[in-house]
Amino acid sequence: MVVTTEAVTSRSERDAEPVQEPLVEKLATEELNILVAVRCRGRNEREIKAKSSVVVDVPDNGVTNEVSINTTDDVGIAAKMNSKTYTVDKVFGPSASQKLVYEEIAEPLFQDFIKGYNCTILVYGMTSTGKTYTMTGDEKLHNGELGDAAGIIPRVLFELFDTLEANKDDYLVKCSFVELYNEELKDLLDSTNTATNSDNKKLRIFDSNVNGTSASGSSSRSSSRNNSPRSAPDNSRAQMLRRKLGRHNTTGNSKISNNNHNKFSRFKQTSQESTRAHASNNHQNVHIPNNNSNNTNQQQSPIDQSASIYIQNLEEFHITSAMEGLQLLQKGLKQRQVASTKMNDFSSRSHSIFTITLYKEQNGELFRVSKMNLVDLAGSENISRSGAMNQRAKEAGSINQSLLTLGRVINSLADKSEHIPFRESKLTRLLQDSLGGNTKTALIATISPAKMTSEETCSTLEYASKAKNIKNKPQLGAFIMKDILVRSITSELAKIKSDLLSTKSKEGVYMSHEHYKDLHYDIECYKTELEESKRAIESLTAQNAMLQQERLSLKDDNACYKANIASLKDNVVTLQSSLKEQITKETNIRSLLKDVQGANEEMKKTIHLFEFKQQELQQSISTFISDEISNIRDTLKKHIEYLQNNGDLKDTEISGNLMRLEKEVVKVIKAAEEEASKSYGECVKMMLKETPRLFESVSGRLDNISKLAEENHSKIAETLSDVSEEYNNLKQYLTNNFFKNNHEELLSHHVQNTYAQLEENSAQLMQNFTMMLDKHIQENKRHMLENILGVTDEVINNELQMFGEQRAKWEKSSALINQCDSVNHSFHQALGSNLVEIRDVVSSSRDNIGATISSIQSRTRNRQSIEEMIQGNDVIRQQITRIKQKNKSLSLFKEHSTETATTSIGSVNKVEGNLKVIMDKVLNDPQLSRGKAEVPDEELHRLEKIPLGITNKENVVDLQHRYPALQEKRKPEDEVLLQAKLQRRNPD
């Protein structure tokens, strides 16, 4: 919203007359108790010199809600038992800082004030207890900032404008400062309060619902009890009003131009209107006659819609910054009544109310009005103790009287009496809405811990505890239309112009020497700044051309950087694919290791089965041979006995021959049995000897392979983790940070905005400074481009420096990948050598076992049968021949003997057949002759394609070409069997 001169002149007198619209929004809320806090200071020098003991028990640090006072002379436990305890909302000890008090008490009320509620903070207590220190404190700035001792009022001012600027809402802020001294009101900000016009400017309290002087058009609102002061003629500049009521587009980059523009605007307005009314920012002292007749309505604020109690002739000052408000506070404090007493060197002799009125944009054309009253009450004092005399005694009596009335009001409100004596004192009338009204109120009671002031301390705590029971019903402030606010400001400006014109027509404008010096100093400053602006514009023009060249250079650099980024992205994609391949290889290694371990377990099971079969075979052979030999012996004995019983063989010596025959047969059978047992024993021993050695070697090689695989896996995992981390960092940096600042657009946008802003600011100076303005713009532009160029170089250097670190990390990740490949290659070579050794051991064991089996087979073939052995025995043949010769005479028994021999031969043949069956069973057992299994060509071809090593994925055929030891395409049976087992366990 912008207030223009045309709008002011086009308004009719009816529009200039303030009219209040019925747009008051009162939101009823629940009743709230007054927030009561107690602040206890430490003992001062007077109390320490008087050796007054501490009788108040409060925490030195932190915040509690209880305070105890010892009203007796007891000490120790008795003192604690007889102490009187008061409960309030907050209790602050001597070490509590000003910041802590503000955050705990004033900060919540300040937030409500911003939301639109009327708020009041009162400081109450005995003299010299720190009321003014709590409310005002150190109001001076130190290095442009508030000190630690700053009180509530300075902190509220600074936080108010910080909050409003952060919210970026339209707003208007006014301040007033009133003093109640000896039951008389005084405007502490009125610099024209002289003896000649003191009667005209006398402040009076009015009640709008009973006094007909409320000419602002507001209806009687008896339910609203607002004690805020009324508006006086506005003394702020029209430029300030336009800045706060309207949205302006000035930026922080054109600070020099804005300062020049503001200073020149103030100078121009001063030269045209000759003066300003109460210009608090520049400490000007303009004397304007007060034509107050028939103007009572104009001095009342037309925007204070809900006020029921107001102060006539109290001036409100527009402020646009916390510094301006702080200057008003300091100005009022200088005029406040202060005196020295025996209890306090700087004792406030009056009550003061500093009021901040906020008009804040709510919804478009509506502004909400809220007030914050910061009340510093004078301290009650004992006249005999303070040494007050004459005028000081009168002041003390007036202070005590007003505080006594305040105490009665607090008691009446706490007891919920029907009659509340607000009108018995001007102080209570001003605080009427703060006590039991529609505001949010906080009371800070200040006390002394010394025993010499225990009575006053008890009285203060009694009032504080009773005030805690007072309930207020806070309501949001009223709404006001924006055009009504503009009409009010227009009316005030019109009155100021009228007063200035009347003053000019009489005797000119009176201006103080200080004001004149300020104006003269401002003019000299303007001239100096104009000269500097000329030089700045010239330099800015030259640097503009340089900046254009830099811009083209930056475009080329940007293209190069984009190409580098594309190349880096390709490298990142390559690295990512390499990482995936390494992960796949690692997975294959793990799978192969599991398969080898499974094959090892299966071979161990086969060994156990072989040992079991060997024991079973030995037992079976031993049992069978023993049974058959027993049967043969029994048969031969039976036939021999039969022959002996049926013939006389002594003469023919058949019995001797038979005995020798029997012995020779038994000898041959035992020799055959021993030879078979020896052959099978040697075979078994050889197999038992070779098999553990074979599997021990295989197990050792497998352990080596497992260890190598684990080491390789850990190295690869660590390396891949580092590579992945560096890759993610590089990717995040390239995505989020690398040249994402749009430097070209920022530079172009910044230059255009700066140039447009300079032109806009210069438009208002074109009337008198056309030629100088062009040079001023060029010089400012040169300075701005110079600064922008420096910032651009710094940004680019920072980007390149940050990218250098990322690039170094990326190169490090490439080295890690190369290291990973080297580790994989070493593992592949070690794995190949171990597999070759395993194959050699398996082949050697296979050859040994095959030789043993061949030896057994050759021995078996050499021993064709028992019959051939018997027939080849000369002794047996001779004995049989002799028997035949001797038995020629025994014709009757020839056939029987032949049958007996035939039966014996059949039994021997049966033994021979059974031995052959057993040998065939041993030699043809599928579980003991797996080494002879043949693998089909298709299966062998498929086994040859199984990956050996995962780095280069070489198959068996490729590996045979590399290692001479594996030139054979057909692998040994045991290796084929191992590969088949691995294939069955992992068919993919």
UniProtKB/Swiss-Prot annotation:
Bias category Polar residues: which stretches? Answer: 248-280
For the ligand (ATP), the binding residues are G125, M126, T127, S128, T129, G130, K131, T132
The cross-references to InterPro entries, in alphabetical order and at most eight, read: KIF11-like, Kinesin_motor_CS, Kinesin_motor_dom, Kinesin_motor_dom_sf, P-loop_NTPase
User: What keyword terms does UniProt attach to this protein?
Assistant: ATP-binding, Cell cycle, Cell division, Coiled coil, Cytoplasm, Cytoskeleton, Microtubule, Mitosis, Motor protein, Nucleotide-binding
Low complexity: which segments have biased composition?
208-237, 281-301
Biological process GO terms, please?
Answer: cell division; initial mitotic spindle pole body separation; meiotic sister chromatid segregation; microtubule depolymerization; microtubule-based movement; mitotic spindle elongation (spindle phase three); regulation of mitotic sister chromatid segregation
Cellular localisation: Cytoplasm, Cytoskeleton, Spindle
* Pfam families attached to this UniProt entry: Kinesin
For region Disordered, the annotated ranges are 206-301, 965-988
UniProt key word GTP-binding: no
- Please name the PROSITE patterns in this protein's record: KINESIN_MOTOR_1, KINESIN_MOTOR_2
Q: Where does the record place the Kinesin motor domain?
A: 33-470
Basic and acidic residues bias located where?
965-974
Q: Which Gene3D superfamilies does the entry mention?
A: Kinesin motor domain
Recorded GO molecular functions are:
ATP binding; microtubule binding; minus-end-directed microtubule motor activity; plus-end-directed microtubule motor activity
- Coiled coil regions, renumbered to chain: 514-619, 707-769
Cellular component, GO annotation:
astral microtubule; kinetochore; kinetochore microtubule; mitotic spindle; nucleus
- Biological role: Elongates the mitotic spindle by interacting with spindle microtubules to generate an outward force pushing spindle poles apart. Following spindle assembly, CIN8 and KIP1 apparently act to oppose a force, possibly generated by KAR3, that draws separated poles back together.
As for family, the record states:
Belongs to the TRAFAC class myosin-kinesin ATPase superfamily. Kinesin family. BimC subfamily.
Q: What's the protein name? A: Kinesin-like protein CIN8
Q: Which organism is this entry from?
A: Candida glabrata (strain ATCC 2001 / BCRC 20586 / JCM 3761 / NBRC 0622 / NRRL Y-65 / CBS 138) (Yeast)
What gene is this protein translated from?
A: CIN8
